[in-house]
């Protein structure tokens, strides 16, 4: 194992967050950059997203609602705060996408946990990041203030698992949610 990888692994196993960019809703603590502090404005948006999902709204509906209410996207909000991000500045600062909403709904960090080793690469020459199964991820509870309660997070994951797309006929196929693409792993709909 290479020195840099060994250091990253040791840090990750101690519970130090390995991510460079903190999740939307948090900012780095000025005294200790490894610690996250709740950003009240962005945290309210995160709570609203979880609340809308609990009420049965899907990611696209939530994104459209946020866009209609002129809520800044995470990258536009960070740019306004003067925080550098890897994303380019969006043309429309309120143009929410369903993928952004899904990414927020799937982040366990909002429950106050630090989650390390979410992805891996096969070797240092392989640049492709692969998702690590939940069993191989290192989850450290109560490392920072929670925005969402654990019970709410679990309920949202349950609600999202039970959602499915409507077909043209309005009926669900018996294979809905059971058949996945062999290439990309996405759910197939019929």
Predicted regions and their residues:
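Conserved catalytic breakage-reunion loop centered on the nucleophilic residue
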Residues: 3-190
């Amino acid at each position: 194992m290479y020195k840099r990888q060994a250091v990253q692994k040791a840090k990750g196993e101690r519970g130090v967050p390995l991510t460079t960019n903190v999740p939307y809703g948090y900012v780095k603590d000025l005294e200790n950059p490894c610690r996250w502090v709740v950003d009240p404005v962005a945290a309210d948006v995160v709570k609203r997203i979880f609340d809308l999902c609990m009420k049965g709204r899907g990611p696209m509906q939530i994104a459209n609602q946020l866009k209609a209410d002129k809520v800044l996207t995470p990258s536009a909000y960070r740019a306004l705060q003067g925080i550098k991000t890897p994303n380019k500045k969006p043309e429309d600062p309120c143009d929410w996408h369903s993928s952004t909403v899904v990414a927020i709904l799937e982040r366990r960090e909002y429950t106050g946990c630090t989650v390390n080793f979410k992805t891996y690469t096969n070797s240092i020459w392989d640049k492709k990041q692969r998702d690590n199964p939940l069993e191989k991820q290192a989850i450290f509870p109560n490392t920072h203030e929670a925005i969402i309660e654990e019970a709410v997070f679990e309920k949202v994951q349950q609600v999202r698992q039970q959602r499915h797309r409507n077909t043209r006929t309005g009926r669900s196929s018996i294979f809905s949610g059971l058949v996945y693409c062999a290439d990309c792993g996405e759910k197939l709909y019929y």
